[in-house]
Amino acid sequence: MSNKEIEDNEDVWKERCMNCIRCNDEKNCGTCWPCRNGKTCDMRKCFSAKRLYNEKVKRQTDENLKAIMAKTAQREAAHQAATTTAPSAPVVIEQQVEKKKRGRKKGSGNGGAAAAAQQRKANIINERDYVPNRPTRQQSADLRRKRTQLNAEPDKHPRQCLNPNCIYESRIDSKYCSDECGKELARMRLTEILPNRCKQYFFEGPSGGPRSLEDEIKPKRAKINREVQKLTESEKNMMAFLNKLVEFIKTQLKLQPLGTEERYDDNLYEGCIVCGLPDIPLLKYTKHIELCWARSEKAISFGAPEKNNDMFYCEKYDSRTNSFCKRLKSLCPEHRKLGDEQHLKVCGYPKKWEDGMIETAKTVSELIEMEDPFGEEGCRTKKDACHKHHKWIPSLRGTIELEQACLFQKMYELCHEMHKLNAHAEWTTNALSIMMHKQPNIIDSEQMSLFNKSQSTSSSASAHGATTPISSTSSSSSSSSKNDDEMEDTAEFLANLAVQKEEETQNN
């Protein structure tokens, strides 16, 4: 379906996720084109409707394919039953062949032909009667392949049981001849292979598993801690900058406006970049831009059903959409609360910024880190008449809040990365992970000699308490067709037992 067909299809917009703000909106706007034509309002169309509709269509297609498979299986079963009950050799019955005559038979008309046609249609399985969407060629081929895999015959060559002590063949679709053999082999892994793996992994040396894991994770943790400390300092600097801004505004509250009001030539006009209005006097241009921006922002809903405890979002609850506003607190055109700047009589824009005295601060972060970012003097023009610095305080606070939101996102990513490192460290030292993964690679010759020496001492010490080794006949009989991972562990276990036996004979 094309995009236009999807937009016009009402079945698509009936799907609801009940998690987005549009699903929770219960009223229509009454101004959009779908509302005027009796369709789903644009403000109530779910963001996930297309995805949910595609999943629904796919689910229906799968059900239809299953119905086709069931009908096909019934037809094949009926055909197979008919062929098995039929006689092996056809019996030839001689019948008197009547001579065909021209014309129709008496009593036969269009009714007989119609009945025969209906009988033929009844014998044919019409898939369109119960399948709204016919499968494609690829889907039909996949169905045939799956059906052949399910009906495939088991392996003609029997496999031997994976238990080293067992000489019988395994069951169908199993690796063992019985449940006892599987439990016995699992017990061998836990009692013989796992301790050896643990000794190899927790080897005290430069190549030990915990030592190498610590060397790998320690610099990453240190880097994350440095980043977190840096972000924490940046957050403190931003809060200190906002406190300095409040103190600077308090010093400007007592001042009175000086000088004449700035006026532009009435012949200068400019076009609005928001609404597109061409002729706007330059004297009213900034206020017009602000009103157009506020009007366009109010038309768009920025909300979420959950409330955050952050200090830089509006978080005003809207009962109409059952959501919390997620605009920046200082720039929200609907719920913004004026602070001490509403009592200002002068503009208050710092003269230090206007005179170019802060050439060293080229970015907002550099301005925040300055000890005296505002200076002592500000613009003494009347607040409503100053067109150069229109509402500079909300703009500055909005910039700081945006920086705080970015810091919060970076902090969240760092915490997630630290959680992944901790989970990796816990999983690596787990018994299941040690059983699944191979031993660490040892490349240095000195480390190899130390490792072999420790292995020989540990094997000689554990030789007295070792269990009775498995007979050579059973091990030789079980050495065929052992290619999977479990057989590799079994072979390693048998090799260790052989080494222990040789050491016992040498010691004796």
From Swiss-Prot:
Disordered: region residues: 95-156, 453-508
GO molecular function: DNA binding; methylated histone binding; zinc ion binding
Highest rank taxon of the organism: Eukaryota
Zinc finger residue extent: CXXC-type: 10-47
Keyword vocabulary terms for this entry: DNA-binding, Metal-binding, Nucleus, Transcription, Transcription regulation, Zinc, Zinc-finger
Regions of compositional bias (Low complexity) in chain numbering: 113-123, 454-481
GO cellular component labels: Set1C/COMPASS complex
InterPro entries to which the protein is assigned, alphabetical: CpG-bd_C, Spp1/CFP1
GO biological process assignments: positive regulation of DNA-templated transcription; transdifferentiation
Localisation per UniProt entry: Nucleus
Subunit structure: Component of the SET2 complex (also known as the SET1/COMPASS complex), which contains at least set-2, swd-2.1, cfp-1, rbbp-5, wdr-5.1, dpy-30 and ash-2. Within the complex, interacts with wdr-5.1, ash-2 and dpy-30. Also interacts with the SIN3S complex, which contains at least sin-3, hda-1, athp-1 and mrg-1. Interacts with sin-3, hda-1 and mrg-1.
Role according to the record: Transcriptional activator that exhibits a unique DNA binding specificity for CpG motifs; enriched at promoters containing the trimethylation mark on histone H3 'Lys-4' (H3K4me3). Forms part of the SET2 complex and interacts with the SIN3S HDAC complex at promoters. Required for H3K4 trimethylation and plays a repressive role in the expression of heat shock and salt-inducible genes. Required for fertility, in cooperation with class I histone deacetylases (HDACs).
Protein name: CXXC-type zinc finger protein 1
